Regions:
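Conserved short submotifs of the Hanks-type protein kinase catalytic core
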Residues: 109-117
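Conserved kinase catalytic-core helix
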Residues: 122-157
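Conserved small/polar residues in nucleotide/adenosyl-binding loops
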Residues: 194-201
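Anionic group-transfer/hydrolysis microenvironments
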Residues: 62, 115-116, 199
Length: 206
């Protein structure tokens, strides 16, 4: 398994995508080098932006070690679940999902269109920026993806197969404990820390 870095990600992309311009002005950056407002605040995967001036790509790799260097045991299959979820959503609402270019199961990497020309809405909304189409787009995305992946539309076997396929208790615990418990202190929450620790203990029993 290759471990991607800023130094080798361009060669990797060239080996996977035949449309990538070998002679272009190639630019590479790693998610996390920019501000939270530019990059978001993910801390699990290693993500790179690669551009040849014409194509703008996101290259995302799952590794055993989190980008944040946290003490987590990570599920290496999480990249495939994310890719599969995006693939399903792209089949339902293709205009609302980044283009999917490649999924490399051997190296646990997938490549998508980079849509960083868009702004992360939560930061913009906090500034009072309004988007007239946002509510309609969110409503259409939620309604369509929820309906067409539900038992109202799918036969029971297909629905249950999908439910089992996307179960990932390891990542769920990491997000619930890592994001909502260990990052919280009594100074920045109205919920008591004792209550949060009790919840963490409960989760360990499940």
């Amino acid at each position: 398994m290759i471990t991607l870095s800023k130094e080798n990600v361009v060669d990797y992309v060239k080996s996977r995508l035949n449309f990538f311009n070998l002679n272009g002005d190639i630019k590479v950056s790693a998610i996390g080098e920019g501000s939270v407002e530019e990059d978001g605040d993910g801390f699990i995967n290693f993500v790179y932006r690669v551009s040849d001036g014409e194509h703008h790509l996101i290259v995302k790799q799952s590794t055993l070690e989190a980008r944040s260097k946290g003490s987590f045991t990570l599920d290496l299959n999480r990249y495939k679940l994310e890719y599969d979820a995006m693939k399903i959503c792209a089949a339902i609402v293709p205009d609302l999902i980044p283009k999917l270019y490649d999924c490399d199961e051997e190296n646990r990497v997938f490549i998508t269109e980079d849509v960083s020309y868009l702004r992360i809405s939560r930061f913009q909304l906090l500034k009072g920026v309004t988007y007239p189409k946002l509510a309609d787009q969110i409503a259409r995305y939620m309604a369509a993806t929820q309906f067409y992946t539900s038992e109202y539309y799918l036969d029971t076997k297909r629905f249950r197969d999908l439910s089992v396929h996307f179960m990932n208790t390891t990542m769920r615990k990491i997000m619930e404990v890592g994001m909502f418990l260990t990052s919280v202190t009594p100074e920045d929450t109205a919920v008591s820390y004792t209550h949060l620790r009790a919840h963490e203990t409960l989760m360990n029993l499940v």
